[in-house]
Amino acid sequence: MSDKKVIGILGGMGPLATADLFQKITLHTAASCDQDHPRVCIDSNTNISDRTAALLHGGADPVPEMVKSAQRLESIGADLLIMPCNTAHNFYDAVASSVSIPVLHMIAITRDALKSRGVKCAGLLATDGTVQTGIYQRTFEGSGVELLTPDNTEDQSAVMDIIYNGVKAGDLTHDATAFRAACEHLLARGAEVLILGCTELPPAFDIYHLDYPNIDPTLELALAAVRAAGCKTK
């Protein structure tokens, strides 16, 4: 397929989330040979500073390195960009304005997927940076999908713990008991599904054998990118 577009992955936020996105692009492309897959360029830029630390705690600005990666990917031939990091979408405008190619918006794609499935209430599992800045709430405004977030500090701390001390730390045997409770509390309050609103959470669900109804924004982004590249999904 000579008319395929090249997907650029602005990655490193974190590395496992980047690998998870690429795997989902590959697994969900309807392909009978290598040539049916989209061409993908990946910059797993681990020099990008922590997004939550920047947003809430005065940490280093991640935008300069994000922009470098975006422009690097465009310069080597990417026709569209995707960012496997929910919190990074707080800096979406800065990245999108730095390049002349489209940047797909993972949170908007997730919103549209929930609407198409008729979901009326979803529970958001995400970093403090994503929850407190309201990026999901703003994107979902007027969508008809109610968003629930953890309503106590213990549950939100459990989400941060599984992300940072579990997945990011590479602890494959991390205790997920408190995180399970946070998930169950959201479902008990009326959430029909849980939004895995940090790209470390889909791997967490696999690593720690979690089984709750959910929507995976990484998967939704992968599907959208494959279609935008001119390939078929499965």
Locate predicted features.
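Non-catalytic structural scaffold of enzyme domains
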Residues: M1-K234
